[in-house]
Amino acid sequence: MDVLVPLLQLLVLLLTLPLHLLALLGCWQPICKTYFPYLMATLTARSYKKMESKKRELFSQIKDLKGTSNEVTLLELGCGTGANFQFYPPGCKVTCVDPNPNFEKFLTKSMAENRHLQYERFIVAYGENMKQLADSSMDVVVCTLVLCSVQSPRKVLQEVQRVLKPGGLLFFWEHVSEPQGSQALLWQRVLEPTWKHIGDGCHLTRETWKDIEKAQFSEVQLEWQPPPFKWLPVGPHIMGKAVK
């Protein structure tokens, strides 16, 4: 079946030729940076309704980190529209990092709707290089649907470990590759070159759980979840936490 992948990729390319030409000419990225926040606002609102109970379960563990100050320093990496804010407990001091500056107005709206949080700042940066943040400055890093689209998951996870305090937690929720040998994986491979343009660099076939397990955290807890939308080529999800 592998021999079919290049042929089917070519067919998809021909069907979406205008998009690929815009990308080749350097015109697509500015368009994508503008429309992508609106797309994410729509999709996250729908998907979070399906995942709400699991999200609340995952992020409820943050309150256990509160010390005598009753505060938690929290970095949301690839913050997007701020859709996770509703799940964070009171007392979180939230710093947001995203390479797309067009998300900031969505973040402002989300913060206005979540007064139980303290909004520190929004940093325009890539996860591979968060030099604006000091070493061991965060109790928690949250990373949801981000490692699929970064240039180097390994470097991002190194930066996460750098900014986390000793014993700090990484909470993650990521979509990953379909099982090896499955027909679903074949279609992910076919669609991925085009999907990366549509999804602002999103990869469909990453085995992100391997990156997390190799990142030298002292402990990793991980569980699998089915994809929220059957009509999208996005595969199963992994959720969990890792301890520095």
From Swiss-Prot:
- PANTHER family reported in the protein's UniProt record: METHYLTRANSFERASE LIKE 7B, THIOL S-METHYLTRANSFERASE TMT1B
Which Gene Ontology BP terms does the record give?
methylation
Query: Where is the secretion signal located?
Result: 1-23
What compartments host this protein?
Endoplasmic reticulum membrane; Lipid droplet; Microsome; Cytoplasm, Cytosol
The answer to whether the entry has keyword Endoplasmic reticulum is yes
Which protein family is it in?
Belongs to the methyltransferase superfamily.
Gene3D superfamilies under this entry? Vaccinia Virus protein VP39
The organism's place on the tree of life at top rank: Eukaryota
Report the catalytic activity: a thiol + S-adenosyl-L-methionine = a methyl thioether + S-adenosyl-L-homocysteine + H(+)
Task: Specify the protein's topology with respect to the membrane.
Answer: Peripheral membrane protein
Q: Which UniProt keywords apply?
A: Cytoplasm, Endoplasmic reticulum, Lipid droplet, Membrane, Methyltransferase, Microsome, Signal, Transferase
Role summary: Thiol S-methyltransferase that catalyzes the transfer of a methyl group from S-adenosyl-L-methionine to alkyl and phenolic thiol-containing acceptor substrates. Together with TMT1B accounts for most of S-thiol methylation activity in the endoplasmic reticulum of hepatocytes. Selectively methylates S-centered nucleophiles from metabolites such as hydrogen sulfide and dithiothreitol.
Q: In which tissues is it expressed?
A: Highly expressed in liver and kidney. No expression in testis, heart, lung, brain, spleen or cultured fibroblasts.
What are the EC numbers? Answer: 2.1.1.9
Per the record, the gene is Tmt1b
Q: Which organism is it from?
A: Rattus norvegicus
An example of a Gene Ontology cellular component annotation for this protein is: endoplasmic reticulum membrane
SUPFAM superfamilies attached here? S-adenosyl-L-methionine-dependent methyltransferases
List the GO molecular function terms: S-adenosylmethionine-dependent methyltransferase activity; thiol S-methyltransferase activity
Question: Per its UniProt entry, what is the enzyme's top EC class, as one word?
Answer: transferase
Q: Please give the chief subcellular localization of this protein.
A: endoplasmic reticulum
Q: Which InterPro entries match?
A: Methyltransf_11, SAM-dependent_MTases_sf, Thiol_S-MT
What protein am I looking at? Thiol S-methyltransferase TMT1B
